[in-house]
Amino acid sequence: MTVSVAVAGATGYAGSEILRLLLSHPQYRAGAMTIGALTGASHAGQSVEALMPHLVELHGRTIEKTEPARLAEHDIVFLALPHGHSAKIAQSLPDETLIIDCGADFRLADKEQWEAFYDSPYAGSWPYGIPEMPGHRKKIASTRRIAVPGCFPTGATLAVLPALTSKLITPEISIVSVTGVSGAGKKPSVGMLGSETMGSARAYKAGGKHRHTPEIIQNLQEACDEPVQVSFTPVLAPMQRGILTTASAPASDELVALTEKDPSAAQDAVKAAYRSFYSDEKFVVVLNGDQQPATQSVLGSNAVHIQAEYDVAARRVVVTSAIDNLVKGTAGAAIQCMNLAQGWPEDSGLSINGVAP
C-alpha cells in the first residue's frame, strides 16, 4: 500500500527540512510513499525551485494554499505552522489521518499554562513526541495525533531526565540553551538581521518568560514525585542552526553522601546513570571521558550528544546536550514519530551522523 504525505507550511525552515528528510526516506525511495500537497499561506502559486532550490527532486512543483479539504486527501499530514493555526486545521481532518503537528498547539496538558504563555485558545493535548521519554514510544505508536516537542524542551529534557529519574539531583534546575538564528523561523525581523546577530550573542526572554518553559517543566515533572523548579534562559548565538544546552542542579542527599565517602565513585555514578538510561536509544550518544557536545557534531543529524559531569566542589550535576534544532529539534523528531506510528523502523530516513566542518 502506498501512503501519501502532505506538508502544510512547507516553505518554512521546519517544513522544508521535513521534505528534505522525506526525500531520503526508504519508503519514498521504494515508491511506497508519495509526497503530495505542499502548502504555504504566503507563497501559494510560487515554485519550489524559487523558494527551496536545495530540494532539487521537488523542482517543478508549486506551493498550494493551505486548505483542509486538500490536506484531507492524504494519509499523513505534517503541520509546520505557527502556533494557533494547527488546531483549526486538525479538527477538519479525518480521524484516520496521521497528523503530526510541529507547532505548539497540542503540547501542553495544562490549560492554564497554555493561556499564560500563548495568545490563542487552548485546543487540548496530544501524545507527546519524544520517544526517548519513558512510556512515550508506546503512546506514539498507537495514535494518529502527535505533538512534536519544541526544540528547547527536547535538548533540555534529554539532558536532565536521567539525573531526575536516578535521583541524582534535587529538582531545582538551571538551564541555559544557546541557539542558532533558524530557531526564530523565516519571518523577517530587525533582531534577526545579519548586522544584529553576527559577532554577538544575547539572552532573551529570561526569567521564566520563554514559552518553552512550561513544556520543559511538564516533561521533567513526569520523572519526579515533587514539584520541579526550572529557571530557563535562551541565548541567541551567531550560527545558523543548533542548540547547545547546559543544565545544572544541586546534588541529591544520596549523591552528596556518596561524595563524602568517595568523590570519584560519585562522579562515576553520574556518568553510569546516563549510559544506563540511554543504552538502548539509537539517537542519544552519551560521550566518553571528558569530551563535550558541540553543535557542529550533530549538524544535519537526528542525534543528541550528551555529557554528564559532577562538580564535586560545588555539589552540582552539570549536563550538556547538543542537537540540531531543525532535525532532532523539529523535523527529525516528526519523522521519527511518523515511523513509530506507521510501524516502520524508528530510524528510517534519519541519520545519527552529523556534517563537519
Curated annotation (Swiss-Prot):
InterPro entries: AGPR_AS, AGPR_type-1, NAD(P)-bd_dom_sf, NAGSA_dehydrogenase, Semialdehyde_DH_NAD-bd. It comes from the Bacteria. The keyword Oxidoreductase applies. Belongs to the NAGSA dehydrogenase family. Type 1 subfamily. It holds the Pfam family Semialdhyde_dhC_1. It comes from Corynebacterium kroppenstedtii (strain DSM 44385 / JCM 11950 / CIP 105744 / CCUG 35717). PANTHER family: N-ACETYL-GAMMA-GLUTAMYL-PHOSPHATE REDUCTASE, CHLOROPLASTIC-RELATED, N-ACETYL-GAMMA-GLUTAMYL-PHOSPHATE REDUCTASE, CHLOROPLASTIC-RELATED-RELATED. CDD domains: AGPR_1_actinobacAGPR_like, AGPR_1_C. GO terms for biological process: L-arginine biosynthetic process. The active site is at 151. Its main location: cytoplasm. Its EC number is 1.2.1.38. This is N-acetyl-gamma-glutamyl-phosphate reductase. Keywords: Amino-acid biosynthesis, Arginine biosynthesis, Cytoplasm, NADP, Oxidoreductase. Pathway: Amino-acid biosynthesis; L-arginine biosynthesis; N(2)-acetyl-L-ornithine from L-glutamate: step 3/4. It is an enzyme of class 1 (oxidoreductase). It is found in: Cytoplasm. GO terms for cellular component: cytoplasm. The lineage of its organism: Bacteria, Bacillati, Actinomycetota, Actinomycetes, Mycobacteriales.
